[in-house]
Design a protein with these regions (language model features):
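Primarily NTPase-proximal linker/entry elements flanking Walker-type ATP/GTP-binding cores
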Residues: 6-138, 145-165, 173-192
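Short, glycine/polar-rich helix-capping loops at beta-to-alpha or helix-loop-helix junctions
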Residues: 143-149, 230-233
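Residue-level signature of catalytic and energy-coupling elements of molecular machines
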Residues: 17, 43-45, 79, 110, ...
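Conserved phosphate-handling catalytic cores of large alpha/beta enzymes
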Residues: 173-176, 181, 185, 197, ...
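Short, surface-exposed connector motifs at secondary-structure boundaries
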Residues: 129-134, 156-160, 188, 213-218, ...
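Long amphipathic alpha-helical segments used for membrane anchoring, targeting, substrate engagement
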Residues: 3-20, 290-449
Length: 449
């Protein structure tokens, strides 16, 4: 996960400062030297780091501990405020025209950044706001680019306008605008061609499209895995074509994350979205304050709540709660809970958003705590059951267990352990409900996840 190493190093810096009653200039300089190295190792631009350290030092030197905050907490606040300022302070959204007019968004970027997939995801995000979208396939060079956009558009329930690969991108863009106006679409998103590297032909094509149709927003998609190259690409696109915002993809991968901290400062353009995975819900609105909180290991509860609201069916959740109270939670409910957890990015993603958890546990610790392979085996066990067995776990006798184990590709001992754990959880749910009903304290129990 991005920023994992940076978060750990910053936490160590703050830990060393917590025992001091007053921050001397020497204390601050020593701490900021470590912060500087941590940021540089995270692939943050040198110029950006230099200015950042200067701003923090000016505020931190000689400050007394105020309002009950210890020095470590005070430095965290100063660093947090500067990180937020560095990434843009305020959240920037795509500016849309009134619904009676057509908003034209042009997507640009290099090949491999995830531009076409991101284009469809943005359409899906804006569709949820009640807009009628049209995607236009303007990439006539890359093999299967048009088909890829059509497949992704279908996933989001968004129409794709295509004229094949024999027409000029400019002509496709103009025809798409006519189609949008004629058929009542109020958002047109142009998926333009990517290149392996920036060249004059590519830039000229984008300029020609902007000259031919009234583009309202030009969004650049860059790959966070490329580090400082992503920052350089943003600066070059802005200078040559003019961009209004950036979408930073693959921030969930094994990347140092420095691009997220550098792009705004270097290009002057805001990050609108960050890609944290493959699903639509993994394209997250970029909130500078929440990202700063994640970097400092303080979690991101607001984003977690929003993910839950977007992915959890409220009616199903209420029905499941009632079944848990009556100890009627069955294997179908187990599958539903697994699906909801997956839609939220998995247990590791959820834990990383909880305050303190991501800071105290490295990625390897989370992996040992949450065995995704073990969860997959348990899900395979449930999927090997018949519908009646899932509804009524009491039906599962030894011969049925043999069949289930064979179907799931596990040994019968694992099936026995899982079913026993499941039954214990159901009993604990019932006991806990009774305790709470009598005014007792809630007890802890482990779900078979």
């Amino acid at each position: 996960m991005a920023f994992e190493s940076l978060t750990e190093k910053l936490q160590n810096v703050f830990k060393n400062l917590r025992s001091k009653g007053r921050l001397t200039e020497a204390d601050v300089k020593t701490a900021l030297k470590e912060v500087k190295m941590a940021l540089l190792e995270a692939d943050v631009s040198f110029k950006v780091v230099k200015q950042f350290i200067k701003s923090v030092q000016e505020q931190a030197v000689g400050q007394d501990v105020m309002n009950g905050l210890n020095p470590g907490q005070m430095v965290i606040k100063i660093v947090n405020d500067e990180l937020v300022k560095l990434m843009g302070s305020e959240t920037t959204e795509i500016a849309l025209r009134p619904a009676s007019e057509v908003t034209i968004i042009m997507m640009a970027g290099l090949q491999g950044a995830g531009k076409t997939t991101t284009t469809a995801k943005i359409a899906g995000k804006l569709k949820a706001k009640g807009r009628k979208h049209l995607l236009a396939a303007c990439d006539v060079y890359r093999p299967a680019a048009i088909k890829q956009l059509q497949v992704n558009g279908e996933k989001q329930g968004v129409e794709v306008f295509a004229m094949g690969d024999k027409n000029r991108p400019v002509d496709i863009a103009k025809a798409a605008l006519v189609h949008a106006k004629t058929n009542g679409f109020n958002v047109l998103i142009l998926d333009t061609a990517g290149r392996l590297h920036i060249d004059e032909e590519m830039m000229q094509e984008l300029q020609d499209i902007k000259a031919a149709v009234p583009v309202d927003q030009t969004l650049l998609v860059v790959d966070a895995m490329t580090g400082q190259d992503a920052v350089n690409v943003s600066e070059m696109f802005n200078n040559k074509v003019g961009i209004d915002g950036v979408v930073l993809t693959k921030l969930d991968g094994d990347t140092r994350g420095g691009a997220a901290l550098s792009i705004r400062a270097v290009s002057g353009k805001p990050i609108l979205y960050v890609g944290m995975g493959e699903k639509l819900s993994d394209l997250e609105q970029f909130y500078p304050d929440r990202m700063a909180s994640r970097i400092l290991g303080m979690g991101d509860v607001m984003s977690l709540i929003e993910k839950a609201q977007a992915n959890i069916d409220e009616e199903k959740a209420k029905a499941m709660e009632q079944k848990m109270k009556k100890a009627q939670f069955d294997f179908n409910d187990y599958l539903d809970s697994m699906e909801q957890m997956r839609n939220m990015g998995g247990i590791s993603s959820i834990l990383n958003m909880l305050p303190g958890v991501g800071a105290k546990m490295k990625g390897q610790d989370l992996e040992s705590m949450v065995d995704e392979k073990d969860m997959a085996r348990k899900e395979a066990i449930v999927l090997s059951m018949t519908p009646k067995e899932r509804e009524n776990p009491d039906l599962i006798n030894p011969s049925r267990k043999q069949r289930i184990a064979k179907g799931a590709g596990v040994d019968i001992a694992e099936v026995n352990r899982f079913i026993k754990q499941f039954e214990q959880s159901r009993k604990m749910m019932k006991q806990m409900t009774g305790m709470v009903g009598k005014g007792g304290k809630r007890g802890g129990f482990k779900l078979p996840f």
